[in-house]
Amino acid sequence: MGKYQKNIGAARRITVMQYLETYHPGELVRKTDREYCTRTHDSLIITPANGFFHWFSRHVGGNNAIDYLTKVEGMDFVSAVRLLNEMAPVA
């Protein structure tokens, strides 16, 4: 497996919750005992048990931090992978 595939794989293993707890801890709001939303987007629901998020008002969702960064924060894929690799460096 090449370096880029390892970087992408490591980034894909980071959950939305891990990303938000690290970079935006004040943004998470517990909605129920199983779900969170964010202070900025109350229709964006995160379910930690399965790793999914869904932003109901925008009709987008995903299951990892790359999806969140590209679909919610508008970051390009390469920048998202680079940022997440800072959290989980590839050996």
Q: Model-derived features: where do they sit?
A:
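N-terminal structured subdomain of primase-like DNA metabolism proteins
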Residues: 1-91
